[in-house]
């Protein structure tokens, strides 16, 4: 099915088969579709509503065209979410990654510039002095030696360049907002993935199952975050042993009080980094930044197999933060990545 026929189909609210979606996505990502066709298709698909089969097929094409990071490790985990929740929180998933690595996890963190917050993971890491221009082999070394490597999305998904213009001009959510976290270049089989709306919690777990993931938690909180929240219960779809279980969790289940997120919002990358450091520092009886990171890092520690239960994962995260090793891990990654910088970049 060419893109003209695909546009006509989705406008009539007809679902595409996986094979049809793969053909259309391949045309989009190899420059065979015009910007107008790309925009028309994405909007038509959004209005119809993307299906699990369509999202899975699109992710398969993106994965096939990406620059891979080959890690010979088990239980590699990612903490990349969709963004787009409007919460303007500091970068919780990035802070969580340092905690998971400090707990013994192997984190292949995939991310880019800002979407929902005023600064994305790449913005915060740059602010922390971490070099992002790594090739696949250098990312592997980071994961193997530090326990955490960051894959800057544009470095690994060059085929996305054809969709960048239409996406910016439309300035509305499309299937691509979902695809980023589904296309980890290291093919991480374990994942905590936040989504921007509750309606995507179960379907995205089904997509990840179809893509071969092993243990994942897809989350969205009642207060609208693409994170596990400290201010409200959070919806979860957990994929484990080939089965998907849906449930709700509350911070109080883990001994963390319900509390406002107003004080952990960030206006820019500098403020976000300050809150990341506050979270990893872990000091103070009242520290909402620490608490939200402990919850989300605990989930990643659980899905990566370090902990047998989510509660145990949160306890491990709290111990790691309290011990100060996560804060040191950030400095270690900054020093390690700077070794890969060319003289012109210094």
Swiss-Prot record:
Keywords: Amino-acid biosynthesis, Aromatic amino acid biosynthesis, Glycosyltransferase, Magnesium, Metal-binding, Transferase, Tryptophan biosynthesis. Anthranilate 1 binds at residue 81. It catalyses: N-(5-phospho-beta-D-ribosyl)anthranilate + diphosphate = 5-phospho-alpha-D-ribose 1-diphosphate + anthranilate. Anthranilate 2 binds at residue 167. Pathway: Amino-acid biosynthesis; L-tryptophan biosynthesis; L-tryptophan from chorismate: step 2/5. One of its GO terms (cellular component) is cytosol. GO terms for biological process: L-tryptophan biosynthetic process. Its EC number is 2.4.2.18. GO terms for molecular function: anthranilate phosphoribosyltransferase activity; magnesium ion binding. Homodimer. This is Anthranilate phosphoribosyltransferase. It comes from Marinomonas sp. (strain MWYL1). The gene is trpD.
């Amino acid at each position: 099915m060419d893109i003209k026929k695909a546009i006509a189909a989705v406008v009539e609210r007809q679902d595409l088969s996986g094979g049809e979606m793969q053909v259309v996505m391949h045309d989009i990502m190899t420059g065979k579709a015009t910007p107008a066709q790309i925009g028309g298709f994405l909007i038509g698909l959004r209005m119809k509503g993307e299906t699990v089969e369509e999202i899975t097929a699109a992710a398969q094409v993106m994965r096939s065209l990406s620059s891979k990071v080959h890690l010979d490790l088990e239980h590699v985990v990612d903490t990349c979410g969709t963004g787009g929740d409007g919460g303007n929180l500091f970068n919780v998933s990035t802070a969580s990654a340092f905690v998971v690595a400090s707990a013994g996890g192997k984190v292949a963190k995939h991310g880019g510039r800002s979407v929902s917050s005023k600064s994305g993971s790449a913005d915060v890491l740059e602010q922390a002095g971490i070099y992002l221009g790594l090739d696949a082999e250098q990312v592997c070394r980071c994961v193997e030696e530090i326990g955490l490597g960051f894959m800057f999305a544009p470095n690994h998904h060059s085929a996305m360049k054809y969709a960048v213009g239409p996406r910016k001009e439309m300035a509305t959510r499309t299937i691509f907002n979902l695809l980023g976290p589904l296309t980890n270049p290291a093919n991480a089989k374990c994942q905590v993935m936040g989504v921007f709306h509750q309606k995507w919690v179960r379907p995205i777990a089904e997509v990840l199952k179809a893509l071969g993931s092993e243990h994942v938690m897809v989350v969205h909180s009642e207060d609208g975050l693409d994170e596990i929240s400290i201010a409200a219960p959070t919806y979860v779809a957990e994929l484990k042993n080939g089965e998907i279980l849906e449930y709700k969790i509350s911070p109080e289940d883990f001994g963390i009080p319900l509390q406002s997120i107003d004080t952990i919002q960030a206006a820019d990358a500098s403020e976000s980094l300050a809150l990341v450091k506050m979270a990893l520092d872990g000091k103070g009886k009242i520290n909402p930044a620490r608490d939200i990171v402990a919850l989300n890092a605990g989930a990643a520690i659980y899905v990566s197999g370090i902990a047998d239960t989510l509660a145990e994962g949160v306890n491990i995260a709290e111990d790691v933060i309290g011990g100060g090793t996560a804060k040191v891990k950030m400095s270690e990654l900054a020093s390690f990545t700077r070794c890969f910088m060319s003289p012109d970049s210094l």
